[in-house]
Structure formats: structure tokens, C-alpha cells
Amino acid sequence: MAISVFDLFSIGIGPSSSHTVGPMRAARMFARRLRNEELLDSVASVRVELYGSLGATGHGHGTPKAVLLGLEGDSPRTVDVESADDRVETIKSSGRISLLGDHEIAFAYDDDMVLHRRKALPYHANGMTLWAYDAEGAEVLTKTYYSVGGGFVVDEDAVGADRIVLDDTVLKYPFRTGDELLRLARETGLSISALMLENERAWRDEDEIREGLLEIWRVMRACVDRGMTREGILPGGLKVRRRAANTARKLRSEGDPQALAMEWITLYAMAVNEENAAGGRVVTAPTNGAAGIIPAVLHYYMNFVPGADEDGVVRFLLAAGAIGMLFKENASISGAEVGCQGEVGSACSMAAGALAEVLGGSPEQVENAAEIGMEHNLGLTCDPVGGLVQIPCIERNGMAAVKAVTAARMAMRGDGSHKVSLDKVIKTMKETGADMSVKYKETARGGLAVNIIEC
């Protein structure tokens, strides 16, 4: 099994990779399967049921909207975010949906989109089942999918096999643990990012890798730029006001940016997460709920570190990807499975290690930075108020971005030797998530979600 950096960093839409990006992909997979098996023309209606965290917080995360767009053939990378809401309202009001854009059928939204708030499927907290029926009401096709975090989707056929979309690509330097990654670095004399580059060559040539990563950086930059200019109230009913644009104006008027670096980092992260909360174009990094941390630290590198350039951006994202794979392989990046430690904690760890890489850190210092970034997010709960990716998510990304820079700086002051390994902290995160009550796993049934009144 192999994971590419482009699996972890994918261009999509907000507000959630597990509740928006994944379900859209799953619904599109279902519709395409109908067409590929020559069943599409016989379909007269479809039904969708969302379970677990998808059912509990799906409305706040835009899951039904994502499913409808996916059934119509849209993908997270290319969907027109400006027209999406109007299209969904048309489906609801007309009672009709066009599968893959060319097969119109009946769809009674109130009856055919079912959210089970307290019922879960056994494999994963983010489960969804889709049915297709013919004109006589006979079942044409039924499929169950699981959105396992970061936009990754597996179907029921993969249950009991691998947790990741299967890929048997042979890598030059395969690794599954931090210890294996460090051993390869010592044996080859390569940096973490250089090892990752060699592995990415299994799918693409170096020019394609570079261009793909710089495209991800361009989308991250555009997201920050939009977030720092747009104002108003975020959707969803909490009446949360955007703050990034006003903060940006104040910081620009207050003098020396170097003296305000940490405030700029916080701003970059909040700008991304305000855009994400509004359903804008973002990059999963490795999830949408934590999408602001890596762009914020990467902006810090480009704007505040002397000598920063696009080569450094490529190395940053490659190193971050290597660390993210360790979390994906050995624990989880899903808030519905392990709490926010799996989302914000993983992103903080990835950003810390990547910053150490571009600051000239050794593989041991990179691993140390990543470990610090995760260690101090252990136990972090996922308790979104109103089921929306707004409170505490937006500010939390800003705090974690600053923490990532601090972790990298701490690691760079040492020689890479430390007591707690990255592997041990990943194992601890997984165990902590298993012990955590379901109330704190993206269900909006505990923590801030029940102590803050929605108004």
C-alpha cells in the first residue's frame, strides 16, 4: 500500500474533508458505478442515509449539499462553489436531480435524504449508504461508503482490508513508521523531503511533482488572500463574524511585520478557516478542519524566513506529507474517530516538521519537531458548536500554527535527540482517541457544543 503526498494535499471545498469532500466523492462514485454497470437509465429514484458523525453534524458541515452535488457528477476539486448553493436549492424545490448531469430523476429531499443522529455503522463513524431504485420501486444498486478522514473514501468491499484506498505502487524507499523513515535517511544520506521526492517519482516525473505542489501552494495563497479581504457573517446560524480582513488591516498599519510575525501566522490560519467555514476553495492539509495550519506556517516561511523560495515550498510540502503519512498509516486524521487531536494535532505536527526541514534541520530534528507538535495536542476534543466548523475550529487553527513554529524552533535548538519518539506519540494519540467518549468526536454532543447556546 502506498500513499502519495497528493492524497494528503487535495484541492477541494469547505467546510469539512470528512463531511463534505469525502461524501461528495462517495456520491459521485455511486453515480459513476451506476453508469459503468449500465444501470443508470433504469434508475427512477435514489435514497441517501447518513450515519454516525455524518448524521449528527451533517447539516452543519454541508454533507447533504455535498452528496447532491456528487450525485450530479461534481468533484470537490472542480465544483463551482459560487453556484453550488443555488443548485442545491433548485434540487430541493423542484424535487428533481440529474444524475451525472444527464439522467434526471425524482428526489424528494425531506424523504430521500435521511440523517441518523444517533445511529452508526460498525466500521467507521462516518458511514453513508446510497440506494438506487427503478420505476417499480425495485432495488437497482445499494452501496455503503465510509469517509475515513482527509477526503479519503473506502467502500464496503474494502472493510476488513486496508483503511486507505488501496494502491500497490512500489516505492523506492517505503516506510510505515518514523523509525523506518529515520533509518532510510541515515542509510541514504537523504533528507526527509528528498526521500519523499524519490517515492513520488513512482507516480510522476519531477517536473510534474514540482508543478503539482506549487499548484497546491497557489491555491493555499489564494485562499489566504480571499480570507483576508472578505467580510461579513459566516453561514450556518451561529452569526460568527469574519475577523481576518479587519485584523489584516490593523497589522498592516502597525509597523514592522517582523515584530508581529506570530500575529501574522495566526491571521493566515484564521483567513483560511474562515474561507473553509464559508464553503470556499481550500486544500485538505490533511483535513479541512485543520486546513489553516500548514498554509499559515508556509506563509510564515515565505514571508519571514530569509532566503525562502519555491524550492523550499516544494521541500516543505514533501516533508509535511511524509509526516502526515505516518499519522494516516498508524492512527487517524479523522476527528470523528480520534477527536481534534487527529486533525489539528496531525496538521501541527506536519507543519512543525516541515518548517524544521526548510530551516535546514537534520532528519532527527525534523522528527523531533513533528513529535513536539503532536505531543502538545494530545487529548484535543472535537466539539464543534452547532456542528459547524467555526467555534472553536477557526481560532484553534491559529493557535496550532503558532505552536508549530514554536515546535520547529525548539527542535532546531537541539541536536535531534529526545525522550519521546514520533512513533510513540502517534501510538499514544491513537490510544487516547480510542478511549475518548463519542461525545467529543465530531458529534456536537459534548464539550463546547453543549455549553455554548446557539443564537
Swiss-Prot record:
Keywords: 4Fe-4S, Gluconeogenesis, Iron, Iron-sulfur, Lyase, Metal-binding
EC annotation from Swiss-Prot or TrEMBL: 4.3.1.17
Cofactor note text: Binds 1 [4Fe-4S] cluster.
Pfam families: SDH_alpha, SDH_beta
Reaction catalysed by this enzyme: L-serine = pyruvate + NH4(+)
Listed cofactors: [4Fe-4S] cluster
Organism the protein comes from: Streptomyces coelicolor (strain ATCC BAA-471 / A3(2) / M145)
Cited InterPro entries: ASB_dom_sf, Fe-S_L-Ser, Fe-S_L-Ser_mono, Ser_deHydtase-like_asu, Ser_deHydtase_bsu
Leading EC class: lyase
GO MF assignments: 4 iron, 4 sulfur cluster binding; L-serine ammonia-lyase activity; metal ion binding
Family: Belongs to the iron-sulfur dependent L-serine dehydratase family.
Pathway involvement of the protein, from the record: Carbohydrate biosynthesis; gluconeogenesis
Name of the protein this chain belongs to: L-serine dehydratase
